């Protein structure tokens, strides 16, 4: 519960900080080659739609883990979160998110990040996208130290509903198995 309150406090502080920004150029203090990153993140935060995330499935690669290990893992990674997202002038998707879910050992795992997807329209209502997410998470088995990462990301968009997936790579060394998980989540744009 303390971690959940901490995550919510951080989200509220970020929101208050963004709302308090009164300069016409919030990225003016950024290094020149990073300004486009700042500007896109600021645009996503300021102009994006509110999103609600739902997670619920984490598939552990059967080619890496033994049946005994798989039986001990939690594959119902229930959780949720909030975010902001938009489709840019080229039709590509940008999202900011803060989520929390139950990890493979049924421990609370928070994550905050940015995701980008290059999209292709199948028809008026259906889009598919491939891209990446840059995030920070923390895990009990790593002493809750913030861990930065980057992961591949894929999604199908249908009107306001999105189904997304990422693959968390890992090690398959005997006795040191970790990662190698397909993580699925859904999103509703509010």
From Swiss-Prot:
The record marks 69 as: Role in lipopolysaccharide recognition. Transfers a fatty acid residue from the sn-1 position of a phospholipid to the N-linked hydroxyfatty acid chain on the proximal unit of lipid A or its precursors. It catalyses: a lipid A + a 1,2-diacyl-sn-glycero-3-phosphocholine = a hepta-acyl lipid A + a 2-acyl-sn-glycero-3-phosphocholine; a lipid IVA + a 1,2-diacyl-sn-glycero-3-phosphocholine = a lipid IVB + a 2-acyl-sn-glycero-3-phosphocholine; a lipid IIA + a 1,2-diacyl-sn-glycero-3-phosphocholine = a lipid IIB + a 2-acyl-sn-glycero-3-phosphocholine. Belongs to the lipid A palmitoyltransferase family. It comes from Legionella pneumophila (strain Corby). This is Lipid A acyltransferase PagP. It comes from the Bacteria. One of its GO terms (cellular component) is cell outer membrane. InterPro entries: LipidA_acyl_PagP, OMP/PagP_b-brl. The keyword Signal applies. One of its GO terms (biological process) is lipid A biosynthetic process. One of its GO terms (molecular function) is acyltransferase activity. SUPFAM superfamilies: OMPA-like. Keywords: Acyltransferase, Cell outer membrane, Membrane, Signal, Transferase. Homodimer. Residues 1-18 form the signal peptide.
């Amino acid at each position: 519960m303390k971690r959940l309150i901490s995550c919510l406090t951080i989200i509220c502080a970020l929101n208050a900080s963004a709302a308090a920004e009164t300069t016409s150029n919030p990225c003016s203090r950024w290094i020149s080659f990073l300004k486009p990153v700042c500007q896109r993140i600021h645009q996503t935060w300021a102009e994006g739609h509110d999103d609600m995330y739902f997670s619920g499935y984490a598939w552990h690669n059967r080619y890496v883990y033994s049946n005994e290990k798989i039986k001990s893992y939690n594959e119902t990674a229930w959780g949720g979160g909030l975010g902001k997202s938009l489709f840019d002038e080229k039709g590509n998707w940008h999202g900011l998110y803060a989520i929390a879910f139950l990890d493979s050992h049924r421990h609370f795992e928070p994550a905050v990040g940015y995701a980008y997807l290059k999209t292709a329209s199948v028809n008026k209502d259906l889009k598919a996208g491939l891209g990446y997410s840059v995030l920070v998470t923390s895990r009990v088995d790593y002493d809750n130290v913030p861990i930065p990462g980057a992961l591949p990301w894929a999604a199908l968009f249908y009107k306001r509903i999105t189904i997304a997936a990422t693959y968390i790579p890992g090690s398959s060394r005997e006795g040191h198995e970790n990662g190698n998980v397909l993580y699925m989540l859904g999103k509703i744009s509010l």
